Amino acid sequence: MKLKTYILLAAAMLPLASCSDYLDKTPSKSSNTPVTTAANLLAVYDYLPNRYCNNYFAAYSTDDANIPREMYLSSPANFDINYVLSYYTHFRDGIINTSSDLLWNNEYNRIYKANLMISSSSEVTGTQEEINEALSCAYFMRAYSFFELATFYCQPWSETNKGELGVPLRLGLSFDEDVSRGTLEQTYAQIFSDLQASEEHAIHDAVPSIPWRVSKCAINALYARIYLARGEFDQALSYANKALQKAPELYDYNQFTWQSPAPKYSATDFWPAMELKVCETNNWNENKILYNYSEWIYPDFASVRTQMAYPSTSLINLYDHDNDLRFRYFYVEHGTRRMSNIKYDWYRYNPWDDGRYLNSGLTTAEVLLIKAECQVRLGQWQEGLATLTPLRKARFEAATSTALTANNQAEALQQVLEERHRELPFYFRFGDIKRFAVTSDTSDDVTVTRDFYDMTVTKVNTGSQKTYTIPGSSKCWAMPIYQTEITSSKGAIEQNPE
């Protein structure tokens, strides 16, 4: 984690320059600008890359991902062993031996920036409101990142697991700081402490005009997400209700249109000449995603550098192909044509910017889904189904949506979880698989199966087919930490057990 104690404000780092005049307060473009004002603190936070982290786990490690043998064989060079196939098959040695883990590094970069803001807050000039906003954002960002790290690198929360390994709780700026992992209970205690501090300094009740600035609505929504992950459904429901009081309106997907002109591709020895029908969001950059998609409570993305999120048949089959606009616009038929070397016809999941991003941020839809699931699990199953009626109306072609129905609580839970899966695939599925494994209801358990090939860290052995079976209860869902980080810590960071 090579980090600096100064804001590096080269021209390329200036975030969203056309969006708001708040950038007039940003320090000069020279490098090594010290943090001396509250505006400097907010500039650290507003830096655009703070809004996303690279995440191959989200793209490839769940049952939402699909890389059939035939797809791989059509173009092996498209599927990197370390950054695609190892994550796809949960191949431990391959993940450990990656040259860098971008999710781990990006999250600790965000944590470092939060620590810089917190440690500098008593020494800067500016109004108390500006300082409070900076502190609220910093504590929130740190809590968000610690929870993200816990989701991917720790065992799921339960009374049994609370003594398992947590994540390094870096709270200062010193490189000599203790980086031992502590326990999962200690990690969550820090997350809750940071959220409490964020709320104490919050100056916005609802989502502000700069949507990534923190509000009490966002704090409540993150509490709801965390308590859902912990299986504390009464608490999650309470915070979801608080968040919904100030949440933005649902984004009506009937507002979306097709990109025009459509991307055109010439004929090849495998593909005919074609135009791909893609949603207008295929052409949305980060700026448009942040501002045009008005449902954000707190925007955040999982970046997929490969731009290859290929959905499984089971995921595709969850949708109404005729009327569900999530399927119509985001699952691109013949989408593998986008990668010219792949000679295998399949869908490509592409919600944003030519498949560069998956949603990982807080939205009104997610909070409604949290509320509905908690209602059902707490016995209020008719109310839980009704909670999702507005969401389905906003996601289906006009006048075609229907209310979810069930005959009992078990059926209602299945309906709500399937709706959650349709709305929040890939990124959210990872955490869901883990938490389902520790609920008292075994009906939600998931096992991921891969029919692929035997692998080493340098080679895919196409002469040796192999089936990988990863139950949700497997300890391997606490993903291994890459070896460079273990080595650089001189053993202070303990590796996850097999």
Enumerate the language-model features and the residues they cover.
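Inward-facing hydrophobic residues that define packing positions of alpha-helical scaffold repeats
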Residues: I111-A114, Y188, L195, A240, ...
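Conserved, well-structured interaction surfaces
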Residues: D80-Y153, G182, L195, E199-V207, ...
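Membrane-proximal, proline-rich intrinsically disordered regions
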Residues: C19-I67, I316-D322, A399-T400, T442-E498
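Extended ligand-binding clefts on enzyme/binding-domain cores
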Residues: L48-Y56, R230-G231, L237-T364, E411-T447, ...
